[in-house]
Amino acid sequence: METKNLAIDALRLPLIILVVFIHMNPTFDSVGYWGLTINTIAQVAVPCFFVIAGYFFVGNKPLTLEMYKVKLKKRVVTLLIPYLLWNLVPSLVLIGGNLFSIVFRGKSTEDLMTFLTDLWNDGVWHLWWDKVNGMPSDSPLWVLRDLIVMCVLAPVFYYFIKKGGKLAVVILLLLYVFLPVSWAHLPGISVIAVFFFNIGLYLRYNGIDLIGGSRMYQLACVTTAFVLLILAVLFRNQEYLYSLFILVGAFCSFVLIGWARPSVVKCFAKFSPTIFFVYAIHQTFVLSYTGQIVGRLLPDSYIGAVLHYLIVPFIATAVCMGIYYLMNLVSPKFLKVLCGGR
């Protein structure tokens, strides 16, 4: 069991790199099938995080009221407090940048006052819910927002899984594949969160390991994921192919990390404490500035665009980790609060 948990910790590293790839927002015109293929693969990252969260929410014992209360109290520290703090960061960065320009460059205060006025008039609470296109202020943390909601609703889901069994999974699968887009991305209860969190609950409730399975299952999973990836890329307007690839691709991720050498697993797992920090900070300013700097060093061509797309996520992830380790030296207690005690 410890080996499998270590593998799950190790999986978080490639998953977070894939998340950074997602936020590169590639276009087909700029990077062609390279970008489209990698971006499609990257979409499995968030579902994997939800599966892991659902799997470990239940534990080995039935979900009782007392256990539920204990778990919610822990989630206040591990999820809610970091969520509230991190969603202040983009606004603080913007305010800080404006103040710097006002003091050192003589810039007018108009932009800063407009931002603060709009923030107040729109409702400050939107920072933590739907500030940016249905996402919170620190946009990648929509995942954390939805995960908090999933944890609150866990007893409902647990009862649904317990009584519905495989039928419950089939119902959720149909909703996941065929639910209209306008319903699929409701803030707090996105279909991705509901489906994959419940998959994690179902697997744990039925004693099915995330890592492992028969050799036939593993080969079938990897083969099916590969075929669906090709189809999803070639027929990129067919949403159901895209959804099916993400589903099978998520399970394929657990298979592939199970195939990794023990030395690779141990190496990847060492970075597990940094993953939440990278997730929270990369979109606030690191990815943008890294992209600008690397972009100046590459030729303005198709090759340059592809190299930019392939290189920047790794550099941005490394920079985020560097900030994490620096903060761990300077202010480990504050860092621990920001990372939910991780």
Tell what function each PLM region has:
Residues Y55-G59, M150, A154-Y159, A193-D209, ...:
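Hydrophobic transmembrane alpha-helices
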Residues W34-V46, K131-D146, P180-F196, I230-C252, ...:
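Interfacial loop-to-helix transition and helix-capping segments at the boundaries
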